[in-house]
Amino acid sequence: MAENAYSKAGVDVEAGYQVVERIKKHVARTERLGAMGALGSFGGMFDLSSLHLKEPVLVSGTDGVGTKLLLAIEADKHDTIGIDCVAMCVNDILAQGAEPLFFLDYIATGKTDPVKMEQIVKGVADGCEQAGAALIGGETAEMPDMYGAEDYDLAGFTVGAVEKQKLITEGAVKEGDTLIGIPSSGIHSNGYSLVRKIFFKDNELTLDAEISELDVPLVEELLKPTRIYVKPVLEVLKEVDVHGITHVTGGGFVENLPRMLTNDLAVKVELGSWPVLPIFDVMKKYGQLSELEMYEIFNMGIGMVLAVAKADVERTLEVLVQNGEAAYVIGEVTTRENDAVIFTGGTKG
């Protein structure tokens, strides 16, 4: 009777059970050393002693995907948005030097569609595999009074660990350090309220619009998953004393690069030192945005920036290339006079 009453209230308990069965195989492939317990336990568990750290510091992060979700819903493509969710969380804690250990997801929806939920969690599991993190728990909440039947929201939470003496904080970056940029895949997961306004409101384009500068339909470009930098950057951290790491997210270069600096330092960014992806030129044109506005909002083709001593530049680039990364020397750290971010040179690409 209780289930029948719950169903009358709009909550499909049976669909929830189907989701659990469907996602088991995806969760299983994220298993890693230290992960404990089984899917369905009240709490996810992790054995910290398995890491053999002398002074472990736990680093946590939580994030969502923002209005990029609206594009996934409109396009009915749900198998990569979970990668975005994982990326936004694990890249953030990587900036402190932490190795992601585990991840939990939260999905809220108006109506539980087991096939759709499986696709979302598949993406989350794909992201966890890329990050080396175990998917140890999550929640799917059906709330018909809060969401439309096709709507959902997705958020995640991750915890990582790092030796206390290897923790990266803003005080380590020094004047004269070199900035090394690692490419993004595209827009990643920030600025989509503006992106959607530019393309679909102001210019009235369709999801499948073909734009000459892009090699795929517009929606395919906009749904490219956020890159996960964990494995190549962890390899760099084994070899090099990295002074600072920035995950270039909302606020672009202007807001994020200063986050690894003390107040007396600034960064000089050499425009033209890396190829700007075509999607950014397209947005600048269609949105009639200035060059500075673009760098204040978007990653402009660089998703993560490392600050290292000049003596370590060559080795850093070598390790990144060995791990399949293109990487660019994009600037340097200098004494601050006015602005924390100074752009020099011209654009490229």
UniProtKB/Swiss-Prot annotation:
Q: Does the keyword Disulfide bond apply?
A: no
Its keywords, alphabetically, are: ATP-binding, Cytoplasm, Ligase, Nucleotide-binding, Purine biosynthesis
Name the reaction it catalyses: 2-formamido-N(1)-(5-O-phospho-beta-D-ribosyl)acetamidine + ATP = 5-amino-1-(5-phospho-beta-D-ribosyl)imidazole + ADP + phosphate + H(+)
Q: Where does the protein end up?
A: Cytoplasm
* Enzyme nomenclature, EC number: 6.3.3.1
Q: Top enzyme class of this protein?
A: ligase
Specify the protein name: Phosphoribosylformylglycinamidine cyclo-ligase
One GO term of the cellular component aspect?
Answer: cytosol
Q: Which Gene3D superfamilies match?
A: PurM-like C-terminal domain (3.90.650.10), PurM-like, N-terminal domain (3.30.1330.10)
| Keyword check for Zinc | no
The record's family statement is: Belongs to the AIR synthase family.
Q: Which GO terms describe its molecular function?
A: ATP binding; phosphoribosylamine-glycine ligase activity; phosphoribosylformylglycinamidine cyclo-ligase activity
Pathway given for this chain reads: Purine metabolism; IMP biosynthesis via de novo pathway; 5-amino-1-(5-phospho-D-ribosyl)imidazole from N(2)-formyl-N(1)-(5-phospho-D-ribosyl)glycinamide: step 2/2
Annotated coiled-coil segments of the chain: none
Q: Name one GO biological process term.
A: adenine biosynthetic process
Q: Which organism is it from?
A: Listeria monocytogenes serotype 4b (strain CLIP80459)
As recorded in Swiss-Prot or TrEMBL, the protein's gene is named: purM
